[in-house]
Amino acid sequence: MNTQNNSTHIEIPENWGMYMQRIDGKPSVTRVNLALYDSAPYSGYQYRIQLAVYYKNQTESGLPTAEENPQLWEIEDAFVELLKQVDAIDAGLMKWNNRLNFFFYVKKPEGMEAKFIDNLKQQFPDYEYKLWVDEDKAWECYFETLYPDKYGMQEIKNNQVLNALLKHNDNLEKERQIDHYLFFKDEETAHFFLETVEKEGFKETAHRTDEGEELPVMTCISRVDIADDIHDITWHLLDIAESFGGDYDGWESPIATD
């Protein structure tokens, strides 16, 4: 992380990811601009704005109903258009605790409530809105609340593969061989890892060593699984790999259709 100097009009990198997390025991669907991580906090953008839009209907978990989601997507689109009209950096959003929360950073918070709430009320008068302003020079909300931990980051990567499969009409509930790639510092730790996962039905299908790399030993392990279960599977392998000083690098799957 480093501090970056910016003019009024700055070009912001974008790489959006979505994942589930729990905050205060409640589930949150979190969408975050991952690309901000390396340059944040942005110099001068020290005020964090949180804009809440309260659902009209929600599930017991505090998430919106499937029926209300399309209306919330329209509100999201309207918010993005309003954000283009001010000097602000969009950090992300959370659907959590019966409300949709937008988070963005500005240099000057004056006039933001009128800009966003008044305009959104005109377009979507049936909703209740609230806006908070907090000084957050270090962008703690971005780093500690919006940005994913290692499990959330793996979920984002998983979703990218799952979405690619769905584009080819994959049936995610159908069993298929799934290949996982992992890296270790030496043959010994790779061997101990393999001994552990083989007890869970995995088998090694490829192995190579690339001298000069920090983790030179690559192993590919495979097992027949359901793609819909991939989050739990990858989180488990990630933990085991890290316990041996290794790195879980990802997975691939053939397309499985009915």
Predicted regions and their residues:
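Long, contiguous binding/interaction regions
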Residues: 1-258
